[in-house]
């Protein structure tokens, strides 16, 4: 039997919406990264973008377990000498773009390269409940019901 290899023209992409209210960031990110890559499909091909288009709503209401909300630090560099900056997860979640916590968690689980950048383009994260993708008729995925550890009371 020959090994199956999906062609980009043969891939059919689904639209999935996930409500992140009360979900644990890492558990949500692993599931989203797997679906973005297409590893949940039997037709998965490593060099083809065969994953789903994923919409995450209420990303500002995610939960970090333990003391990570206060202790987890995100670093970035300005490009200037000595320009390393740091922010805690709490300051990002209470700041202007709280959806970046979820975006960074997923981004760091996707391979870095041209295909990874295309796959990250299939992810849309919104801090509130509204999203402009109703025309795509996304199906709802209840991540909290998949495993009792996926959801925490804030």
Curated annotation (Swiss-Prot):
Return one GO MF term.
Answer: structural constituent of ribosome
* Spans annotated as Disordered: 132-154
Superkingdom, taxonomy of origin: Bacteria
Q: What keywords sit in the KW lines?
A: Ribonucleoprotein, Ribosomal protein
- Report the SUPFAM superfamilies cross-referenced here: Ribosomal protein L13 (SSF52161)
| Gene Ontology CC annotations of this record | cytosolic large ribosomal subunit
Family statement: Belongs to the universal ribosomal protein uL13 family.
Q: What does this protein do?
A: This protein is one of the early assembly proteins of the 50S ribosomal subunit, although it is not seen to bind rRNA by itself. It is important during the early stages of 50S assembly.
Its recorded name reads Large ribosomal subunit protein uL13
Tell me what organism the protein belongs to. Answer: Rhodopseudomonas palustris (strain HaA2)
């Amino acid at each position: 039997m020959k090994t199956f290899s999906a062609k980009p023209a043969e891939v059919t992409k689904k639209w999935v919406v996930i409500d992140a209210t009360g979900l644990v960031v890492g558990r949500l990110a692993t599931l989203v990264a797997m679906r973005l890559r297409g590893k949940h499909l039997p037709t998965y091909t490593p060099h083809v973008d065969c994953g789903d288009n994923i919409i995450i709503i209420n990303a500002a209401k995610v939960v970090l377990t333990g003391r990570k909300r206060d202790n987890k630090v995100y670093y970035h560099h300005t490009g200037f000498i000595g320009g390393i900056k740091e922010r805690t997860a709490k300051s990002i979640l209470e700041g202007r773009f709280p959806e970046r916590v979820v975006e960074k968690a997923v981004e760091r689980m996707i391979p870095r390269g041209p295909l990874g950048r295309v796959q990250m383009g299939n992810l849309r994260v919104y801090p509130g409940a509204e999203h402009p993708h109703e025309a795509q008729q996304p199906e709802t995925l209840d991540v909290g019901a998949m495993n009792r550890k996926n959801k925490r009371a804030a």
